[in-house]
Amino acid sequence: ATAAHELARRGRSVLLLDRAWRVKPCGGAVPPQLLTDFEVPESLLVARINEARMISPKGRNVDIPVGQGFVGMVDRDVFDEWLRARAAAAGAARRTGAFVRREHDADGVARVVYTDGRSRHGAEQSVRARFIIGADGALSQVARQCIPRADEGKFVFAYHEIVESPAYDSEAFAHDRCDVYYQSPLSPDFYAWIFPHGKTTSIGTGSLQKGFSLKGSVARLREATGLDQARTIRTEGAPIPLHPLPIWDDGKEVVLAGDAAGVVAPASGEGIFYAMTGGRLAADAVEAALATRSARALASARKRFMRAHGQVFWVLDIMQRFWYTDDDRRERFVAICRDEDVQRLTFDAYMRKRLVRAKPLSHVRIFFKNLAHLTGLATT
């Protein structure tokens, strides 16, 4: 929807093909930077998070204040529809359906074949397209059919239950606090969460481990926090990409964006900001390809994204690969997060969407604190 909006507002003829019948499974967190960069009204926020609580394997809590700012929470059904409507208002044609395959007409122009309507089993329709932006999720059919090495993507499998939020705050739940559990019974290699969304709350978990019971984990978490008494509204599951794909375009007419390109932050699973950023960069790449009449411009989407965010993804990937591997390391990871410099730099990076280079002494302190935990010189 972001890519469609960007191109439509520039006067391009755009078809937005979307599986509008499906609510995207998502924790729903957005940084204030997203509201600014993409002109999103604060009225779409259903909650403002002022604190994050990290719970270690031994049950030790670290409460991290957000500081100056907040983490916004959105409901994806409302938020995504607003994005689609904005694209349509800018001039994009909307159509509900699902991508089936790409074909080519006799003159070499691509033709997108899709199922029409609110089901994958609808009648097949087709439309000619000079360029195609594939933003059809982690298991993207556009990527699998059109992009080299798309099968190299790896995923965390996530599951959450949307429940009615408790009427009152308690030790186990607060309407303005996100809780993140680093405990192997809840996730052997990722984390479990409780994310308030105003009237509703997302309770979920993720894991790379096949056979791990995600539903069982959420049931245990709900029972431990008393949220098993809350009414369940719906349940959802979806894969979360672990790494950006190595190639985002086919060198001819297709470029990827969002989960289809693998742009979900390692360690945190944050994806909305990066999906919208990828959508804008894909639109820029298509605009450049149209202007220059060269499909080489499509490669600029990945180059620009990785130049802006690749370092953050690299750091988060290292963090996940090391600190999430067992409960001993996760206990130490949570202990490190008690450090005020770690807290401040983490949320500064989250808010601004870049690594913070200020206060070099803080980085030195954090480095030696990490080193102490890695070598076992520090105690938890």
Say what each PLM segment does.
Residues T2-C26:
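Glycine-rich FAD pyrophosphate-binding loop
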Residues E6, R86-R231, P246, G262:
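Predominantly flavin-linked oxidoreductase catalytic cores and closely associated redox partners
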Residues L16, G134, A257:
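Generic enzyme active-site microenvironment
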Residues P31-L35, D151-E152:
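Short, hinge-like loop/turn segments at secondary-structure boundaries
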Residues Q33-R86, G97, R102:
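A conserved beta-strand/loop capping segment in the N-terminal third of enzymes
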Residues Q209-V286:
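FAD/FMN-dependent oxidoreductases across multiple families
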Residues E287-T380:
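C-terminal helical "tail/cap" subdomain of flavin- and related membrane-associated enzymes
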